[in-house]
Amino acid sequence: MAAPQPQAAAVSSASGVSGPGSAGGPGPQQQPQPTQLVGSAQSGLLQQQQQDFDPVQRYKMLIPQLKESLQTLMKVAAQNLIQNTNIDNGQKSSDAPLQRFDKCLEEFYALCDQLELCLRLAHECLSQSCDSAKHSPTLVPTATKPDAVQPDSLPYPQYLAVIKAQITCAKDIHTALLDCANKVTGKTTAPSTGPGGSL
């Protein structure tokens, strides 16, 4: 009957044994590694740069500012209107200084101009992307990434031929427009080589 007692004592001692962090106080906490902090900072900076250069992201960031500016503009306009009405009626207006309506209106127009530029830039990028996909739909392999060559990629000599054909077409269009303008104005000038000069 004495045998179960050492086993029970062993079980109780085993259950009471704790790790080095629990018996001797709190264990060492994991500190963030410097590489993780640097990586997160670099990713945040890269994301901020992408937002600055991307017109769509810039547009999304400016929309809340435009709403807030419009609300401020309406509020300032109402306050100025109430004050002017009180002055016209001979009533005493509040002595609190009011915001200038022209400054708020100028800020609102500045945000509108920025939004217009973002939309124009986004439209221009979309047009260039569509033109690139239309006139040069295949990819061109680069010498720095030979492994990234795709089966439908365009060889570089053939790509140069396509570019030269596009330049020739642009020159022909420029010459035709110049001749048309000269005929309309009645002027005769020497034939121009067009944009870019000779190849």
Swiss-Prot record:
Gly residues: compositionally biased ranges: 18-27
Entry's family note: Belongs to the Mediator complex subunit 29 family.
Keywords: Acetylation, Activator, Nucleus, Transcription, Transcription regulation
Protein name: Mediator of RNA polymerase II transcription subunit 29
Record function comment: Component of the Mediator complex, a coactivator involved in the regulated transcription of nearly all RNA polymerase II-dependent genes. Mediator functions as a bridge to convey information from gene-specific regulatory proteins to the basal RNA polymerase II transcription machinery. Mediator is recruited to promoters by direct interactions with regulatory proteins and serves as a scaffold for the assembly of a functional preinitiation complex with RNA polymerase II and the general transcription factors.
Top-rank taxon: Eukaryota
Biased segments, Low complexity type: 1-17, 28-47
GO biological process: positive regulation of transcription elongation by RNA polymerase II; positive regulation of transcription initiation by RNA polymerase II; RNA polymerase II preinitiation complex assembly
Entry annotated with the keyword Transport: no
Record region (Disordered): 1-47
Gene of this entry: Med29
Complex formation: Component of the Mediator complex, which is composed of MED1, MED4, MED6, MED7, MED8, MED9, MED10, MED11, MED12, MED13, MED13L, MED14, MED15, MED16, MED17, MED18, MED19, MED20, MED21, MED22, MED23, MED24, MED25, MED26, MED27, MED29, MED30, MED31, CCNC, CDK8 and CDC2L6/CDK11. The MED12, MED13, CCNC and CDK8 subunits form a distinct module termed the CDK8 module. Mediator containing the CDK8 module is less active than Mediator lacking this module in supporting transcriptional activation.
Pfam families hit by this protein: Med29
GO cellular component, one term: nucleoplasm
Localization: Nucleus
Principal location class: nucleus
InterPro entries per UniProt: Mediator_Med29_met
Modified residues (N-acetylalanine): A2
